[in-house]
Every structure is written in C-alpha cells, then in structure tokens.
C-alpha cells in the first residue's frame, strides 16, 4: 500500500517510480549548470574576447537569483493550465536553455570582431535569457516535490533520489567533457595544444539539447500523474488566490525568508565559483602544473568523499530533522 498515489487519510504519497524520475529534472538543470556556468566565462574570454566581463557577468547573475527565484515562484503559484502547473514551466525552461546555448556557443561567435559592442550586448542578453530558463526548471524541482508527496516518511527517499539525479547530471558532464575535449584540441606541427577543446563550441552545443530532452521527458513522466489541481493544496484542499502585493509583503517582513534567499544565492554563487573551469585551470594547470592528470581524479575523489556525508545527513534528518542535520554537517564541513 505504500506505493499508492494517494490515501484516504489526507496524506499525499508518491509511487516509487515517481520519486525516482522526478528528481531527474535536477539532473537536467545540472547538465546546463556545468555547460554554462563552468565554461561560459572561459568561452567569453577566449572566443568572444570579452576579457573579465564574461566572468563578472556570470557572478552578478548568480547574485540576482535571490530576486528572480521568488518572482518566478510567485508566477508559478498563480499558473494553472490544462497541461498542469509544472510541466509547462519545465518544457518552456528547457526550450529557453537549449536555444540560449545554441545562440551563445554557435551563433554569437559569428558576430565579427569589428562589432565588439554588439558582442557585449548580445552576450549579456543571451545569458540573462538563459538564467530565466534555468530558474524555470530549478523552481519546478523545489515546488513540484510538495505536489509529489507530503508524507514525511517519503521525504528522505526523495532526498536520496534528488541527490542521485543532481550528481548524475553534473557528474556525467564533468566526467564526459574533459574526455571528449581532447578530440577538439587544435594542435600545432609539434603536437602542442594551440587552442583547447574547452574553447570550441562544437564540444557541447550538440550533445546538450539531446541530454536535456531525455531528462525532461523522464521528469514529465514522473510528475504527470500528480500535476493536477487536486494535489496543489495540502490534502487536496482548495487554494485561495494570493495577490502580488501579499507576496511583496511576505518578502519585506519575513526575516527568515530573507535569510533563506541570501543563503540560497550565496550557495549558488559559491558553487559557480568552485566549479568554474577558469578556477580549475588555474588550480590544476597553473599552480599544480598538470590539469589533464589531476582534474578527473580529484573530481572523482570529491564525489567519493561526499557519499558518507550524504548518507549520514539523510539519517540525521530522519531522526532529528533537517535543521539539525544542516547545522551539524555544515559545521563539520567548515572545520574540515
């Protein structure tokens, strides 16, 4: 009976396959996270010749997540279509990101160097549009889980699948691109690398829409049965319409919400910096002198050491709650 979709006791429960498939939306967004946030700064500097502007724009846009996330969340809350509340945002977000990647990595380099002002403008606009699509999908991941299940006993299981989905999307791209990029290196007559494959748009502009399409399809299958109005309210209750002014009032006066927004934006910014290819090239290539030999082993070790923390944090959350788990393991991470 634990795999039934809903119960008469008012608790909304998900089937196992739904818990497994829906977090693949997180994996889908992480494919783009690696593709854009890890490589766009280097691409903007080496191919578009935008210098530090590319890195600066990426950093500023991550800070702006604290503003765009609640706005799109409010828009999602007021949306209800014949195709559901969440699926339209997933599909639209995926299309926006796919088009943005193609425009950024394939079309934008076609703008001649004599029109550098146009490159700056188009780079900013395209990247901003990509951020909107990215926020569409990440907001679905957070909001959709409340529709999928409100059973406290299923939340730890959802957390496990969500983490696996996130690691699949990010890990596959982080592992695959360095292996493939050697085929796109431009060498001189002596065999030395003149242009790194990381600076070649062909490396990732084709494989990403395919990967994201598969991930979104599986995600839609996971939530399709639950993306209906009777699951939008707690226990299937009818929701009241919330005015936009009420959202602003909550943001203005709710101090815990403000802290959450700042913390969320800060975590995203830190992750974007830590996984940026420019930073990793400086660390493993310049400081340690051997990027190709060090990057993949260090990345794999990072995932290996993350697994015990993940399992322990889930266990602590089940016993003492998510707040206690977060405080404990963030403290351990800071000490380490």
Regions found by a protein language model. Give the residues of each.
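Membrane-embedded alpha-helical bundles of multi-pass transporters/translocases
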Residues: 2-336
